[in-house]
């Protein structure tokens, strides 16, 4: 009560914020006369002066906001015959300040965006405008380009149907770029798989405006963008490698200078295989290749290595078992079967080849990121939506975004009626159909909102029986739906739509419909989120139009059944509600809203919890991508990095074979074998006599440096640096993919630590950090091994970068991109789905029974 009194006297925080913005609106309005008296050329010249002030650093965007907004308003009048209202100016300022502008349906968010877009595009750093589907991205870019082009800005659009990097790069190089959240995110991931900077398509992440921000940053927060694909190894290679491995003879380790007999030696201590010179020669003959360790045969060499490990280091019924013709890992710590897990780096396929069972193609995560972490990369993030206040806390805590509710230009006249609640769903369905028939009889248009495609089908079938003409929209074809939803306000129209269908398109009505009471919104059940319900209500009553909204519920609805249905049921029983009768009560409506608040709170905590885990991986991702970008820079001193890695490798290897602290006892035989195998370099025990541990490490480093320099001496410096850079990148990428796989495994089982009275998040941070340290060392040491072992001819040297790019392109072409919800699944994505596979929309149905059907259905046409 006291809080309400304070609000009545001083206003809410939102009221005070809006009041501040209104003061500036007055200043902008005062400039309207000045700019409307200028010719087109004079207006453009005036704008160019302000742009030059930004580029020179003489002024910043806030200094010139009033003039720029006034110029954009005048430009809108001249090019589109549309004048920004005062409340739209407020919306523009809210967006420029990096906040969320909550603007009701029909208030012109698309036009509002032009104000901050123009202001922030003046720096030349680019502005991104994000929408939920391709249709809206293309529509908004085309509609607003008249304003942008008049003021000298270029506009690009990113569409999922575009297959060319060239098209995407051209769009990103524009001053203003429109596109979907999925495409922006995937382009970022793909850019961080490129082998040169010029091939990247995105520029700096400067300023982004996210339309329908609640859908993208809240609803899709738990859905990561993932590029996954098969490994680079063909299944045939494992079969060949298995046959070769069976013909190779195991030898015994001997002390140098004697050479081991046989084709390979087993290093059981380090669980490794060392192939002898004789073994290499035999393998090359059996494979029919000239050089097993050339770039072209690197995968084959790896497959042979794994095949030899499978035959000599992994024993059936000890390390794995065969069950139903599948290789299943035996956990080395518990002895239990680890069903669902697979050995990485092709070892599992090698074991399958060994046991002559079906070799399964293993997909791997090539790159991933959540929308939460992608959009937080921007220097400034802003958003627009009709519904954000219910999630204001989450926007503030997760994204540091304040939500400002913008007043409507004309007061809302829509009647939001209390819910009608029935005992059973069948009673509710009948009541909805009767209400549709009443409205339809007088010509009042009705929009029926459903929570699922399945419910849409129920009402579609019932309306067919009643012979009522109608349309059914299931968020399948955005462009076709947009055309249909525009007509949903016409006389006699009945439209059934899932929550997301046709979003972003206004439903307009004429005077005849206004006289009938406007558009009638019928919600067939409450969503778990109040925000989704508000979105449905908001389809009626745009720009001061009349309208009606009402929800029809039943005690069998999931929300009421799980959260609070007992209390409502007891009320209905006390009132003696009979079959077919409903209860309409503000108390009951509030009880439903309280149930929704419970669910919203649970979902918020879940998203927050997931983000805490993803933030750990995100810091690692940023570190790897930052280092990768350094390697792409031609001025980066990769040779210095290699020298540093050689020194660390030398110290690490030497420590493995020093048997006491003084360094007087060294296992030189195994050390020599390791250096010869991994670095193709022979060392002499004499070189290390009477040296301390540190001196021995330095000596080994010096020997390897000299060996490396000699190996590469025939190459020109520029060629050598390019080889080093490309090979280093390949090692980094492969190690990063393996790391993502290990992180997935860790995350899958980390929750079980809670049973041992340990905080899973703390444990996850510890173990992921250890995995990251292993990743860093793997990159350092594997790059050294590859650089020492690889052999190439001049043609391979010249085509190295092209070859790397071709292999990467093949990997991307065979990859699967998994992104956000069904509203973002366009035709291009659905075409890739097999008919009997689960539908990507998450309905649980087969694709052919869901989105695999033909486009939007029509009922009996009038």
Swiss-Prot record:
Binding-site list for ATP: 88, 106-110, 506
Cofactor: Zn(2+)
GO-annotated biological processes: intracellular protein transmembrane transport; protein import; protein targeting; protein transport by the Sec complex
A Pfam cross-reference name: SecA_DEAD
One GO cellular component, as annotated: cell envelope Sec protein transport complex
Subcellular locations according to the entry: Cell inner membrane; Cytoplasm
Co-factor binding details: May bind 1 zinc ion per subunit.
List of residues binding Zn(2+): 839, 841, 850-851
Name of the featured protein: Protein translocase subunit SecA
Source organism: Campylobacter jejuni subsp. jejuni serotype O:23/36 (strain 81-176)
High-level lineage: Bacteria, Pseudomonadati, Campylobacterota, Epsilonproteobacteria, Campylobacterales
């Amino acid at each position: 009560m006291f809080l309400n009194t304070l609000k009545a006297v001083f206003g809410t925080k939102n009221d005070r914020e809006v009041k501040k913005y209104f003061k500036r609106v007055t200043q902008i309005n005062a400039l309207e006369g000045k700019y409307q008296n200028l010719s087109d050329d004079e207006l453009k010249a005036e704008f160019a002066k302000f742009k030059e002030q930004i580029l020179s650093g003489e002024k910043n965007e806030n200094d010139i906001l009033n003039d720029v907004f006034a110029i954009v308003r005048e430009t809108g009048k001249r090019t589109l015959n549309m004048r920004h209202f005062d409340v739209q100016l407020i919306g523009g300022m809210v967006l420029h300040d990096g906040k969320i502008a909550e603007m009701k349906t029909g208030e012109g968010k698309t036009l509002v965006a032009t104000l901050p877009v123009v202001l922030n595009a003046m720096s030349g750093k680019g502005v991104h405008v994000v929408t939920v589907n391709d249709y809206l991205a293309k529509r908004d870019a085309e509609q607003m380009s008249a304003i942008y082009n008049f003021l000298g800005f270029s506009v690009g659009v990113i569409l999922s149907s575009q297959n060319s990097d060239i098209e995407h790069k051209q769009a990103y190089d524009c001053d203003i770029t429109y596109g979907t959240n999925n495409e922006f995110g995937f382009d970022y991931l793909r850019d961080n798989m490129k082998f040169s900077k010029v091939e990247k398509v995105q520029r700096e992440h400067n300023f982004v405006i996210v339309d329908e921000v609640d859908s993208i940053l809240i609803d899709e927060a738990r859905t990561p963008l993932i590029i996954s694909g098969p490994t680079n190894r063909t299944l045939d290679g494992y079969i060949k490698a298995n046959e070769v491995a069976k013909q190779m003879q195991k030898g015994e380790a001997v002390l140098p200078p004697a050479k081991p007999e046989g084709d390979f030696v087993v290093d059981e201590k380090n669980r490794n295989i060392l192939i002898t010179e004789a073994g290499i020669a035999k393998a090359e003959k059996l494979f029919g290749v000239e050089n097993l360790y050339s770039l072209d045969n690197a995968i084959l060499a790896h497959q042979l290595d794994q095949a030899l490990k499978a035959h000599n280091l992994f024993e059936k019924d000890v390390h794995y078992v065969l069950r139903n013709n599948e290789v299943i890992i035996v956990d080395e710590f518990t002895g239990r079967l680890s069903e669902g897990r697979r050995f990485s780096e092709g070892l599992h396929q090698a074991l399958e080849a060994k046991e002559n069972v079906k070799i399964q193609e293993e997909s791997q995560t090539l790159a991933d990121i959540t929308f939460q972490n992608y959009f937080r990369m921007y220097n400034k993030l802003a958003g627009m939506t009709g519904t954000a206040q219910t999630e204001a806390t989450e926007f503030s805590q997760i994204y540091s975004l304040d939500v400002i509710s913008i007043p409507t230009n004309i007061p809302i006249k829509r009647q939001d009626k209390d819910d009608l609640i029935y005992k059973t769903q069948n009673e509710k369905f009948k009541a909805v159909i009767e209400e549709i028939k009443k409205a339809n009889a007088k010509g009042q248009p009705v929009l029926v909102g459903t929570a699922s495609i399945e419910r849409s089908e129920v009402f579609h079938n019932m309306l067919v029986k009643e012979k009522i003409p109608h349309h059914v929209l299931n968020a399948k074809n955005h462009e076709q739906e947009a055309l249909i939803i525009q007509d949903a306000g016409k006389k006699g129209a009945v439209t059934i739509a899932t929550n997301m269908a046709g979003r972003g398109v206004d439903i307009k009505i004429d005077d005849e419909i206004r006289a009938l009471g406007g558009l009638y919104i019928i919600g067939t059940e409450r969503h778990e989120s109040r925000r989704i319900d508000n979105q449905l209500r908001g389809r009626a009553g745009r720009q001061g139009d009349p309208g009606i909204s009402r929800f029809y519920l039943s005690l069998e609805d999931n929300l009421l059944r799980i959260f609070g249905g007992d209390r409502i049921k007891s009320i209905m029983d006390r009132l003696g509600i009979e079959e077919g009768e409903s209860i309409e009560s503000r108390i009951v409506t509030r009880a439903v809203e309280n149930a929704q608040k419970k669910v919203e709170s649970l979902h918020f905590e879940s998203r927050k919890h997931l983000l805490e885990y993803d933030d750990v991986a995100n810091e690692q991702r940023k570190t790897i991508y930052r280092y990768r970008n350094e390697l792409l820079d031609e001025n980066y001193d990769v040779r210095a990095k290699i020298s540093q890695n050689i020194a660390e490798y030398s110290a690490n290897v030497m420590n493995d074979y020093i048997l006491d602290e003084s360094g007087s006892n060294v296992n030189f035989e195994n050390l020599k074998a390791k250096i010869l195998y991994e670095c193709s370099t022979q060392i002499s025990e004499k070189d290390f006599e009477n040296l301390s541990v540190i001196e021995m490490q330095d000596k080994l480093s010096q020997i390897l440096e000299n060996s490396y320099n000699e190996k590469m001496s025939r190459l020109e410096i520029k060629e050598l640096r390019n080889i080093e850079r490309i090979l280093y990148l390949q090692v980094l990428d492969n190690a990063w993919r393996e790391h993502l796989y290990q992180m997935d495994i860790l995350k899958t089982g980390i929750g079980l630590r809670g049973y041992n009275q340990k905080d899973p998040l703390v444990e996850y941070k510890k173990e992921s950090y250890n995995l990251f340290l292993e990743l860093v060392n793997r990159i350092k040491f594997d790059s050294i091994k590859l650089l020492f072992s690889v052999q190439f001819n001049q043609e391979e040297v010249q085509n190295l970068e092209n070859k790397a790019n071709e292999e990467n392109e093949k990997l991307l072409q065979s990859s699967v991109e998994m992104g956000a919800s069904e509203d973002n699944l366009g035709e291009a994505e659905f075409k890739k789905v097999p008919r009997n596979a689960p539908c990507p929309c998450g309905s649980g149905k087969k694709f052919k029974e869901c989105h695999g059907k033909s486009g939007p259905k029509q009922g009996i046409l009038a």
